[in-house]
Structure formats: structure tokens, C-alpha cells
Amino acid sequence: MIGEWNNGTGRRKSSVARVFLKKGSGKITVNGKDIQQYFGRETSIMIAKQPLVLTNHVETFDIQVNVHGGGESGQAGATRHGITRALIDYDATLKSALSQAGFVTRDAREVERKKVGLHSARRAKQFSKR
């Protein structure tokens, strides 16, 4: 496995994706299922494939992804981040193009915690004058 496989770990919200890629025909497997089956929405599939489209490697690699935690959007973002890191592991010259597109940087936005005395993170109880 070492040598022919390149790997990368991606994170987004509360999702973590471990990505393994090797030379192949372009088959992407997420948690044992085809990417079309795993991500129901076309936008999630598009987000996950963005680094491959940018670097013209859509049908160059077979990719295996193990992803857990979070929802569909977070998992798609984590997969994108992981694929980006795996591509950089494969070829370091791709880093500048991927970095310019903003795929290398981890999106640090997380859900803000709920505070005591409020309905949610920022929503206060309804104010009544009388």
C-alpha cells in the first residue's frame, strides 16, 4: 500500500475524511459506496470533485474515502479538503493552483454553542414591554 497510494486527511465542521488515491480510471468510492450513491445531491458531488476538476485529474485516479461525522455538506467539504491534501502528497507542484482556489485552507467555521438564558447561540427570548 505504501508507495502507490497517496493519502490526505480533510476536515470540515464536525466531519473527518481520510482519502486514499492511486492511479486508475476515475472511480471514487465513499464509505464503500459509489460517490453518486453516497452523496444524494449533485452539489455535494460537485464540491467533493472540485480539486480534481481544477487540476484536470478527474479520470486519472481511483479514490477511496472514509468519512464520518457531521452531515452531507460537511462530509463533502471534508472530502474536498482530503482530496486536495492527497493530490499535494502526489504532486507538490499542484499546491499553488489548489491554494489559489482556496482548497488547501481548512474552513475553520464551526457551529457556535448555545448560551444559557438564550433560545440558541444568539437568539434571545422574546421581549414583552407589558
UniProtKB/Swiss-Prot annotation:
<dbReference type="InterPro" id="IPR020574">
    <property type="entry name" value="Ribosomal_uS9_CS"/>
</dbReference>
<dbReference type="GO" id="GO:0022627">
    <property type="term" value="C:cytosolic small ribosomal subunit"/>
</dbReference>
<dbReference type="InterPro" id="IPR014721">
    <property type="entry name" value="Ribsml_uS5_D2-typ_fold_subgr"/>
</dbReference>
<dbReference type="Pfam" id="PF00380">
    <property type="entry name" value="Ribosomal_S9"/>
</dbReference>
<dbReference type="InterPro" id="IPR020568">
    <property type="entry name" value="Ribosomal_Su5_D2-typ_SF"/>
</dbReference>
<dbReference type="InterPro" id="IPR000754">
    <property type="entry name" value="Ribosomal_uS9"/>
</dbReference>
<dbReference type="GO" id="GO:0003735">
    <property type="term" value="F:structural constituent of ribosome"/>
</dbReference>
<keyword id="KW-0687">Ribonucleoprotein</keyword>
<keyword id="KW-0689">Ribosomal protein</keyword>
<comment type="similarity">
    <text>Belongs to the universal ribosomal protein uS9 family.</text>
</comment>
<dbReference type="GO" id="GO:0006412">
    <property type="term" value="P:translation"/>
</dbReference>
<dbReference type="InterPro" id="IPR023035">
    <property type="entry name" value="Ribosomal_uS9_bac/plastid"/>
</dbReference>
<dbReference type="GO" id="GO:0003723">
    <property type="term" value="F:RNA binding"/>
</dbReference>
<protein>
    <recommendedName>
        <fullName>Small ribosomal subunit protein uS9</fullName>
    </recommendedName>
</protein>
